[in-house]
């Protein structure tokens, strides 16, 4: 299994629709101002988060249970800047829609700009033949409110191509998050 380069990422995005919308180069400014970069890097693709957020709150004093998750634990927010409360988290989704090839596994890592501020991005791997918008989780590990900027870079996707195709892909087994288009809450 090997990590894939910028040339491969461009080819797969442009010819196979692996990433849409797609930025073939790293974008570092927008309308004259500096932004957290997004787009194609040497061995990865920096994704943006959309302006749709679900901010965790405990106003209902419920227990967080992944088998029986209460959607009331979140407050929906739409905007260019999301403020995450101290020691809390928010969910968002990528601007980009992904179509992962059958012989590729994609791993997501946080960007250092956010990590150096105590904001951690968590995403599970994008499995072979998974497709959809990626649900992102941002943890604010600080005792202060923290900002996340919509339509700017938030995480980097690394693509690993296997020497052979998997026997059963995410699509083959009917994965529960296949084709998700918005911020998706836990499912069992």
Curated annotation (Swiss-Prot):
Q: Name one Pfam family in it.
A: DCD
* Enzyme class per UniProt: hydrolase
Pathway listed for it?
Pyrimidine metabolism; dUMP biosynthesis; dUMP from dCTP (dUTP route): step 1/2
- Sorted UniProt keywords: Hydrolase, Nucleotide metabolism, Nucleotide-binding
Active site as annotated: 137
A Gene Ontology biological process in which this protein takes part is:
dUMP biosynthetic process
Alphabetical list of SUPFAM superfamilies matching this protein = dUTPase-like
User: InterPro entries from the entry?
Assistant: dCTP_deaminase (IPR011962), dUTPase-like_sf (IPR036157), dUTPase_trimeric (IPR033704)
What catalytic activity does the UniProt entry give for this protein?
A: dCTP + H2O + H(+) = dUTP + NH4(+)
Q: Name one GO molecular function term.
A: nucleotide binding
Q: Which domain of life is it from?
A: Bacteria
Into which family does the record put it? Belongs to the dCTP deaminase family.
Quaternary structure (record): Homotrimer.
Protein name, entry field: dCTP deaminase
């Amino acid at each position: 299994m090997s990590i894939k380069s910028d040339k491969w990422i461009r080819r797969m995005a442009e010819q196979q629709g692996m990433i849409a919308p797609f930025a073939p180069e790293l974008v570092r400014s927008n309308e004259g101002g500096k932004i957290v970069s997004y787009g194609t890097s040497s061995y990865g693709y920096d994704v943006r988060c959309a302006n749709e957020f679900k901010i965790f709150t405990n106003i209902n004093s419920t227990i967080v249970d992944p088998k029986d998750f209460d959607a009331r634990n979140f407050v929906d927010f739409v905007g260019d800047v999301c403020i995450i409360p101290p020691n809390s988290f928010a969910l968002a989704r990528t601007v980009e829609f992904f179509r992962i090839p059958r012989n590729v596994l994609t791993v997501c890592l946080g960007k250092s700009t956010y990590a150096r501020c105590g904001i951690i991005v968590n995403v599970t791997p994008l499995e072979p033949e998974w497709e959809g918008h990626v649900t992102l989780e941002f943890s604010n590990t600080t005792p202060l409110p923290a900002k996340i900027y919509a339509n700017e870079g938030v995480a980097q996707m690394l693509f690993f191509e296997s020497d052979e195709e998997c026997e059963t892909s995410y699509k083959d087994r009917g994965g529960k998050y296949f084709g998700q288009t918005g911020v998706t809450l836990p499912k069992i």
